[in-house]
């Protein structure tokens, strides 16, 4: 069995939904697989390939989810907190030695100016307005030629940083094999199946949201509702609209949900 992130998508039936989002049609597995292939080709066209580090600064939601999977399949994904200030982006982009930065086409993030300072090409993501997670990539500038070789299990899929609470944040590289094994283990532990739907309220620049919510669901052939992020006021409306079978969160979120629950009894 292949142990790369893109192979997780093979579990889902072509017509089955993979990604849901408010106010959009679901992205189905067959289309998701085609989309990943197209994004990898677009990255290669920009001169990006295997093990090239691509920083991602996108808001939480379906496009962040599909961008992570697609970019990790063709290069190395390095998601960053979109709320960072310029000085934080300056540190992380330099520390990553990023070969490109992916931003929403209309983004006014300070990461754009920092990328210009560091001579990092910006690739703009133009979202599809109808289907959750579909997008096109546009770049005004090519990167020097990268490797178009196929990704293997030992290649780095994801780069995160430690919190840096006691010292300088350190790079944590995670391989395809590591992420695939962990996501399958989570799925087996939770007995996830293709019938399960996860309501994701976790940020997708942290391992919790990327692994426990997104990849574990895809590994089971299930679906994920990609919300803009945690909002206790909207949580029960999302539950009613999408009828997920499970969600995952940190203790402070659980507490906020429990506090709000009595007002939403019966919804």
Residue map of PLM features:
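AMP-dependent adenylate-forming
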Residues: 6-28
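Conserved pre-ATP/AMP-binding loop-to-beta segment of ANL
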Residues: 129, 142-161, 167-168, 191-197
């Amino acid at each position: 069995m292949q142990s790369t992130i893109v192979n997780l998508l093979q579990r889902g039936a072509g017509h089955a939904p993979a990604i849901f989002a408010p106010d959009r049609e679901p992205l189905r597995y067959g289309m998701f697989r085609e989309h990943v292939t197209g994004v990898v080709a677009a990255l290669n066209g920009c001169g990006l390939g295997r093990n090239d580090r691509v920083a991602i600064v996108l808001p939480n939601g379906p496009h962040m989810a599909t961008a992570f999977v697609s970019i990790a399949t063709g290069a190395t994904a390095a998601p960053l907190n979109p709320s960072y200030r310029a000085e934080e982006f300056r540190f992380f982009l330099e520390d990553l030695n990023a070969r490109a930065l992916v931003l929403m086409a209309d983004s006014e993030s300070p990461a754009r100016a920092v990328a210009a300072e560091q001579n990092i090409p910006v690739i703009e993501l133009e979202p599809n307005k109808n289907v959750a997670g579909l997008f096109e990539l546009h770049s005004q500038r090519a990167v020097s030629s990268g490797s178009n070789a196929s990704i293997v299990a030992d290649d780095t899929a994801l780069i995160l940083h430690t919190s840096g609470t006691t010292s300088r944040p350190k790079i944590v590289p995670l391989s395809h094999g590591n992420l695939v094994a962990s996501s399958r283990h989570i799925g087996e532990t939770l007995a996830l199946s293709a019938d399960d739907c996860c309501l994701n309220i976790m940020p997708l620049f942290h391992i919790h949201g990327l692994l426990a919510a997104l990849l574990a669901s895809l590994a089971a052939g299930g679906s994920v509702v990609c919300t803009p992020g945690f909002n206790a006021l909207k949580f029960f409306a999302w539950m009613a609209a999408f009828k997920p079978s499970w969600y995952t969160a940190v203790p402070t979120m659980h507490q906020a949900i429990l506090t709000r629950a009595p007002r939403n009894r019966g919804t």
